From Swiss-Prot:
Role noted for this protein: Catalyzes the removal of terminal sialic acid residues from viral and cellular glycoconjugates. Cleaves off the terminal sialic acids on the glycosylated HA during virus budding to facilitate virus release. Additionally helps virus spread through the circulation by further removing sialic acids from the cell surface. These cleavages prevent self-aggregation and ensure the efficient spread of the progeny virus from cell to cell. Otherwise, infection would be limited to one round of replication.
Binding site for Ca(2+): 292, 323
Binding locations of substrate: 115, 149, 274-275, 291, 373
Quaternary structure and partners: Homotetramer.
Protein name per Swiss-Prot or TrEMBL: Neuraminidase
Active site: 148 (proton donor/acceptor), 408 (nucleophile)
Keyword Membrane belongs to the record: yes
Catalytic reaction equation(s): Hydrolysis of alpha-(2->3)-, alpha-(2->6)-, alpha-(2->8)- glycosidic linkages of terminal sialic acid residues in oligosaccharides, glycoproteins, glycolipids, colominic acid and synthetic substrates
Virion surface face residues: 35-465
Record Pfam families: Neur (PF00064)
Residue numbers spanned by region Head of neuraminidase: 88-465
EC number: 3.2.1.18
Annotated family: Belongs to the glycosyl hydrolase 34 family.
């Protein structure tokens, strides 16, 4: 037990009553995750008696006190593990975060200009992360907000449900690529920045900057733009380094309490893997649906064994191609590993697991347009193996219509008391080109209830206003 978690209770007994003094040396972050609450609601009065003395004037009253110390050892917060998903058979519209509906606000209430939003959850709260350009709307710093990488970008967060304004946002670190996750005790934040030829991964655990990882291919080292995944105190992060139009081999970093303890080098179909969206299929396996920006419209699919710390990559075999741009579904001939055509370019895709006692559901998102970042549709496949199943995925509803932007999407899970709620988030970009501001809203859909997905999402933002 760490010294910081020791609570010392000193009880002073006096002839006139009781004084309780509680010395708490645990940190606030620890107390937030403790299930123990100390309450003192009853009064204690020391007993008194009447003294009959023959000569009362010679009696001297002496106050004596006794001190008794009791030490309470409170348990550490638990490491998190994946649990069964909460019950449900369909996703519904849960939340829209559309900051620029409040674009008339100025000063600290102005919405930040952001892109690449994602959500990560701990036992008690979820955080909405994004990469900001260190600018707000309205404002005078719109130039450059369409760039992917520059010296001003930062990883920021707000509590999920808050609008990412200047005053609401926490700035975690300088970064033009990011990730974050909670191990059950503390947050791990990941940020990447630096020149394209020598970028650097930085790790922050709680409030401390703890470790770094250097570029290994000297070609835009970057991470997944969605939540990393933790089990038993170990957090797994996908990274890649290489050409956007050629070879870019990924790795996984195993991180514990902010320190890199192992590198994992995947085998298999490793030519190009980036922007993976990952989650737990079980307590043994992390699965990721990723982006190949160079060769194929199929998604590279990773299986990482957390018991052996080994990973393998193969292409998804389904005839429902999930990247954008993409060819017609079912048009790629040959074995599952065939790349097909229209493989140049791509987009990060949403992916989340529905873990059930007797089966597993894998939920995916893809744009409705085959060529543009417009619209977003939800798909599901129960059981089977994504490496070998060639069947089409089942469409499960429209989250964003063809009239609205559908850019990056991602998966995450909200912690309920006894189960985990799978969700998919969608980045809806306001693309003002290079002459004005360029930012995003976030739409969130979660597993809840039964029936059909009922309603799509609009941002409600008119950039001309």
């Amino acid at each position: 037990m760490l010294p910081s978690t020791i609570q010392t209770l000193t009880l002073f007994l006096t002839s006139g009553g009781v004084l309780l003094s509680l010395y708490v040396s645990a940190s606030l972050s620890y107390l937030l995750y403790s299930d123990i609450l100390l309450r003192f609601s009853s009064k204690i009065t020391a007993p008194t008696m009447t003294l009959d003395c023959a000569n009362a004037s010679n009696v001297q009253a002496v106050n004596r006190s006794a001190t008794k110390e009791m030490t309470f050892l409170l348990p550490e917060p638990e490491w998190t593990y994946p649990r069964l998903s909460c019950q449900g058979s369909t996703f519904q519209k849960a939340l829209l975060i559309s900051p620029h509906r409040f674009g008339e606000a100025r000063g600290n209430s102005a919405p930040l200009i952001i892109r690449e939003p994602f959500i990560a959850c701990g036992p008690k709260e979820c955080k909405h992360f994004a990469l900001t350009h260190y600018a707000a709307q309205p404002g005078g710093y719109y130039n450059g907000t369409r760039e992917d990488r520059n010296k001003l970008r930062h990883l920021i967060s707000v509590k999920l449900g808050k609008i990412p304004t200047v005053e609401n946002s926490i700035f975690h670190m300088a970064a033009w690529s990011g990730s974050a996750c909670h191990d059950g005790r503390e947050w791990t934040y990941i940020g990447v920045d630096g020149p394209d030829s020598n970028a650097l991964i930085k790790i922050k655990y709680g409030e401390a900057y703890t470790d770094t990882y250097h570029s290994y291919a000297n070609n835009i080292l970057r991470t997944q733009e969605s939540a990393c995944n933790c089990i038993g105190g170990d957090c797994y992060l996908m990274i890649t380094d290489g050409s956007a139009s050629g070879i870019s081999e990924c790795r996984f970093l195993k991180i514990r309490e902010g320190r890199i303890i192992k590198e994992i080098f995947p085998t298999g179909r490793v030519e190009h893997t980036e922007e993976c969206t990952c989650g737990f299929a079980s307590n043994k396996t992390i699965e990721c649906a990723c982006r190949d920006n160079s060769y194929t419209a199929k998604r590279p699919f990773v299986k990482l064994n957390v018991e052996t710390d080994t990973a393998e990559i193969r292409l998804m075999c389904t005839e429902t191609y999930l990247d954008t741009p993409r060819p017609d579904d079912g048009s790629i001939t040959g074995p599952c590993e065939s790349d097909g055509d229209k493989g140049r370019g791509g987009i990060k895709g949403g992916f989340v697991h529905q873990r059930m006692a007797s089966k597993i559901g894998r939920w995916y998102s893809r744009t409705m347009s085959k060529t543009e970042r417009m619209g977003m549709e939800l798909y599901v496949k129960y059981d089977g193996d994504p490496w070998t199943d060639s069947d089409a995925l089942a469409p499960s509803g429209v989250m964003v219509s063809m009239k609205e932007p559908g850019w990056y999407s991602f998966g995450f899970e909200i912690k309920d008391k006894k189960c985990d709620v799978p969700c998919i988030g969608i980045e809806m970009v306001h693309d003002g080109g290079k002459k004005t501001w360029h930012s995003a809203a976030t739409a969130i859909y979660c597993l809840m209830g039964s029936g059909q997905l009922l309603w799509d999402t609009v941002t409600g933002v008119d950039m001309a206003l």
